[in-house]
Design a protein with these regions (language model features):
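A structural detector for beta-sheet-dominated domains
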Residues: 33, 62-65, 186-188, 265, ...
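Non-catalytic, mostly N-terminal accessory regions of nucleic-acid modification and defense proteins
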Residues: 31-36, 147, 207-211, 215, ...
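Generic structural signal for hydrophobic residues
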Residues: 16, 199, 274, 340-341
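Amphipathic alpha-helical segments in well-structured domains
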Residues: 13-17, 255, 376
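A general structural signal for short secondary-structure boundary/capping elements
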Residues: 48-50, 64-66, 75-77, 232, ...
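Polybasic, glycine- and aromatic-enriched phosphate-binding surface used to engage nucleic acids
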Residues: 102-317, 323-326
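Non-catalytic DNA-recognition/assembly elements of restriction-modification systems
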Residues: 89-93, 97, 103-136, 198, ...
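Signature of N6-adenine DNA methyltransferases within the class I
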Residues: 1-131
Length: 376
């Protein structure tokens, strides 16, 4: 049976995974390293299920390059592939791309009560839904021309506006000078007739473009007031290419719904410590299993999936936050992982170097597989 690969990794398929694992003795999944259908970013798998077998129960995953390799596949290779123990739960099946030692390490970590999910220290929520970004999000030139500066706040609309693990006033000003749309129009919460002239003029312009007739705007009492305008402590990316990112907010900015907003639950742990702690091989490895990839190479997270990520937290440490931020801006993530893994996972949590190397390998294996599927 040919099915979408979402079977592996989405919550709404959880009951299907449980049914398959309970009903069949052995499940074989054949996957492709490259996308196999023209013109769509959809990953598919072949699902082969067997019932009432005497032995060798479980699940195995066989990878082939493309349809050509599938046509010439040696079925002995399939029969000789390792059959792994199948966890009869709602857990995602992405982990079965790993070998047995890697799977067992992840299971060991999940039962380690020292390592808690992100939800213990942060709430994650979606960003602002403006209803019409072209109207509400402005660049510096437009703001100046229409004299709207007093009626704006800072906003981030794309992940590439972030360069490091902190978004500060200097970053904002650079984006502003580049004429990026980093100003959000927020007129006073008043009826149109009582608004300042600059706001009335701009709102009138929006109505000539029929922006107020769009669904999201039309259901508001005052269409020009964007709801949920709170400023987060940090941002996490909804979609990532290389690795999951948590960015401290030091620019008093909010974000659109392409970027999730984070509130920290405690003042006992500094934002800098949380941001540094996020950059470790354990959290990165679990991110590839917790998030979802639909075939285009991008890893996607809903707020609840970020909250589920295991996040070991640094205790007292001497890691230089500014140095790590600089390395991230230089795209030297491996060097950052070396620094944080050494302090957090090895020194503080007493993981062995072999275990940390395995976790790094899991992240690289799964992220490499994901990004390799960007094209046929």
């Amino acid at each position: 049976m040919v099915i979408p690969a979402e079977l592996f990794q989405v919550k709404y398929a959880a009951e299907t995974r449980v049914f398959l694992s309970n009903f069949f003795s052995r499940i074989t999944i054949v996957t492709f390293r490259k996308l196999v259908f023209d013109d769509i970013q959809q990953e598919v798998v072949l699902l082969l299920c067997e019932k009432d077998l005497a032995d060798n129960h479980g699940i195995r995953v066989v990878e082939v390059e493309n349809l050509v390799e599938l046509e010439n596949i040696d079925f002995d290779i399939i029969h000789q592939s390792d059959v792994k123990y199948l966890d009869h739960s709602t857990e995602k099946w992405t982990k079965y791309f790993l070998n047995e030692d890697e799977i067992q390490l992840l299971r060991k970590i999940k039962s380690d009560n020292r390592i808690l999910p992100c939800s213990t220290i942060m709430d994650v929520d979606v960003g602002i839904v403006t209803g019409k970004n072209n109207f509400f999000m402005l660049n510096k030139e437009t703001v100046s021309e229409k004299k709207l500066m007093p009626y704006t706040t800072h906003v981030v609309g794309k992940s590439n506006y972030f360069k490091g693990i902190v978004y500060n006033e200097e970053d904002f000003q650079k984006n502003s000078e580049a004429n990026l749309p980093v100003y959000l129009f927020i007129p006073p919460a008043k009826d149109y007739a009582t608004l300042p002239k600059e706001c009335r003029d701009y709102i009138s312009y929006g109505e000539t473009q029929k922006y107020h007739e769009g669904y999201k705007c039309s259901i508001r009492k005052l269409w020009y007031l964007t709801p949920s305008l709170w400023t987060p402590d940090a941002f996490v990316l909804r979609q990532v290419g290389d690795y999951p990112k948590l960015i401290l907010n030091q620019a008093e900015a909010s974000s659109t719904d392409t970027i999730h907003r984070v509130r920290f639950k405690t003042k006992a742990i500094s934002g800098e410590t949380i941001a540094l702690s996020y950059l470790n091989s354990l959290t990165f490895a679990f991110s590839e299993i917790t998030g979802r990839s639909y075939g285009g190479g991008v890893l996607t997270f809903e707020p609840t999936e970020i909250e589920e990520l295991p996040l070991p937290i640094l205790g007292k440490h001497n890691i230089d936050f500014k140095r790590v931020d600089s390395l991230i801006r230089q795209r030297k993530i491996e060097e950052v992982l070396d620094i944080v893994d050494r302090e957090l996972l090895i020194k503080q949590l007493k993981f062995s170097e072999k275990e940390v190397k395995t976790l790094r390998g899991i992240w690289k294996k799964l992220s490499g597989r994901r990004t390799n599927r960007k094209s046929k």
